[in-house]
Amino acid sequence: MIRKILAAGFGLALMSTSALAQPEGESFADWKAGFRDRLSAAGTSDETVASMLDGLEPEMRIIESDRSQPEFVRPIWAYLEIAASDLRIRNGRDAYARNRETVDAVAAQFEVRPEILVAIWGLESSYGAIPGNNDIVQALATLAWEGRRRAWAEGELIAVGEMLDEGYATRDQLTGSWAGAMGQMQFIPSTYLERAQDWDGDGRRNIWTHEGDALASAANLLSRAGWDLGGPAILEVDLPEGFDFAAWQPHDSRPVSQWAQLGLTPARGEWSADHLMRAARLELPAGGFGPGFLTFDNFRVIKRYNNSTSYAIGVAHLADRIAGGEAFEGPWPEDNPPINRTQTRELQTALNSLGFNSGTPDGIAGPNTRAALRAFQRSRGLLADGYVGRQAYAAVMEAAGG
């Protein structure tokens, strides 16, 4: 879900709870007393304030989950093995078949592709089977008390108060991920207020147990974000021998006709007239030795749901597979996986020492790190894809004498 941490089923490696962290300073009781006043001042009714806060205690494992930073980065090919596994594809086709009338009606009303809705449903909650069972109020209250994202978490709790006061949901329905996302489509409370839908007209936006409400809510989000009905999301492409990676920019959008002039070809079939008229970016999620993808405006719409390239590729590919499409053609460079956080910090330090500014070493391979790596690669006559993998790490460390 937009603005939420990718959590339910996909991803954060949780640290051991043998040494549970506790925020320093303010006690939970003191935070709760102060927030009770802020919640009331926001217009929440006394009854709802009591239902949310009376007897509420923190859940310490949520703090551990929030603070944990996985050491190892999952390669995109490993992610896709789960996101678009044979089981998930089969379950997606079954879920679509069971709910075809609802899915198609929702897709038609909001003008989105039905298989995309089903794919998001599959990644967010395994088609409604695993929506999360954490108490959302407890989760958000714990995150607010912990303090790292207090303003955000308190804002989401105020949104919960509005949900309850408006009768959109009941207190016992408010379950989801430890990060505050709810229901079959994993909406955070503020997004729920903005985008959730009452498909069956019963007066509630039941994204927890009502498939129509859940699907319509996701469809409304995609529609409002600009989904282009009939437009593609991604297209796997082959790059020509001698492709000029040094001139490529990750966010460079140009007509597909221009990409074709640069020698790119579809991995399967031929260019369609529709493709050639659209603008697209070239994504290389595993670097220049892995599959390439042209990504279109609908790809950016998917990222409004979850701002992760792997997630967006996973949704688009799962949707295509549910619709009967084939697996990706190009092989993944499994001998050149992403490096871990410690190695990334070492890489950043080495790049800085060599005069390629990657910013303050933090172990996160962001845009500055990739740009610095590309500059290093160009200076050494290497394939300048900026992919922070094992081979690039070895080259930089050797150059730095590490």
Language model features with spans:
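Intrinsically disordered, serine/threonine/proline
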Residues: 25, 32, 63-64
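N-terminal secretory signal peptides
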Residues: 28-50, 54
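Bacterial N-terminal signal peptides
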Residues: 7-17
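Positively charged n-region of N-terminal signal peptides that target proteins for export
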Residues: 1-4
